């Protein structure tokens, strides 16, 4: 798997930009930073309008896309294409940039998270990806083509239909069994990418998958959490043991207190 010295590559691509244009590009994509900056934040720093920042960004990207930079850009874009293709041709945005940075960027000793924005930068330079906005059913996604989007949406809709039919949370193995009914030879990475893209499907602390609206998947209070741990262990438990099991499952950072569990169980 190719590992790119991404800091050197980025420096090469922005070295001929003006100081302001370089800063706008690095700030907008959050390259080497903890997060990206908005048009408004950059505009306030320079005393210019959001639209002017947008123009500077667009001009800088056009300059970077100069054919002379193609030998520098193309290897990373090719790796992006293959990476997304191996996951069914479409990935949720945050998973794509995080996973690609971990697998393909050499940035030590810095954390790869600081260079997730570089993946977004190259997605924009590639020019062949389709980006879909967040909607009621999916998070923002990047796809190689419309057919990949259609395939993912078909799989997700089928799996949601299975959940509504079976009315239960299932293990990943059982989930993959459903996927095989939709496609006899499913790509496990594509199925995982589909799950990451879907807003209405999630897994609980016991790695069981289901609809995010279900209490078994998104327990909302101590009573739901107590039900889940007792269902899983299938044996009588003292309320102090229930509290301990809830905390062990780490449903949330909030600690379950034995007295709270007791009060919920006797309601």
Where are these regions (language model features)?
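C-terminal non-catalytic scaffold/interaction domains in large multidomain proteins
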Residues: 1-267
